């Protein structure tokens, strides 16, 4: 299972939100390029970027930082937040990003996402952010009546690379991921799932590893890395070693 460090950009700085609340911001760095290089040096195989300004307004606001990061790194970079048109996605993919993540537009214009994925196979990711099982959009500000698993099923036969499944209630809390929601998401679609939200310790990563056979292939980690609760290098090593062993029985109780 791949661990993907996250950098959330707000006003050009690296921040984390608590449960997606723009009024609950923790600022970690004013130098996103240096932060990105740090994750790469610690062994990250991919970087996850979020333009929080873009997610809230629909207008790109951190392009200079995004370009600087992609130019500085040698690992693939994926970006979400405010990517709501085919033109914007095409431009980003042509400027060095490996993948673009579409959330709001995936709910509002799913066919556009399918067509974009056909043009860029393996480079389009659908971000499904859920609150109490229902899809939330526009930077998690607006709630819909669409079930997250139902939206995932719409893209099962498409050329998208993956689905990022975020449980908003756990995001930024460090209280553990919503394993049941991730299990349901993985079972609802044949597309690989990337877990996001709630990871706070090594035990959470080991718990997620039990979902890998279902198609949960990676996990995005933010605050736990910044707070030092998880060391990226040590976590990568521990996951690699755990894959060679049977998972602890107590981690499987929820799925018996």
Swiss-Prot record:
Belongs to the HisA/HisF family. This is 1-(5-phosphoribosyl)-5-[(5-phosphoribosylamino)methylideneamino] imidazole-4-carboxamide isomerase. Its main location: cytoplasm. GO terms for cellular component: cytoplasm. It comes from the Bacteria. InterPro entries: Aldolase_TIM, His_biosynth, HisA_bact_arch, Isoase_HisA-like, Isoase_HisA-like_bact, RibuloseP-bd_barrel. The active site is at residues 8, 129. SUPFAM superfamilies: Ribulose-phoshate binding barrel. The keyword Acetylation does not apply. Keywords: Amino-acid biosynthesis, Cytoplasm, Histidine biosynthesis, Isomerase. HAMAP family: HisA. It is found in: Cytoplasm. Its EC number is 5.3.1.16. GO terms for biological process: L-histidine biosynthetic process; L-tryptophan biosynthetic process. It catalyses: 1-(5-phospho-beta-D-ribosyl)-5-[(5-phospho-beta-D-ribosylamino)methylideneamino]imidazole-4-carboxamide = 5-[(5-phospho-1-deoxy-D-ribulos-1-ylimino)methylamino]-1-(5-phospho-beta-D-ribosyl)imidazole-4-carboxamide. Pathway: Amino-acid biosynthesis; L-histidine biosynthesis; L-histidine from 5-phospho-alpha-D-ribose 1-diphosphate: step 4/9. It comes from Synechococcus sp. (strain WH7803).
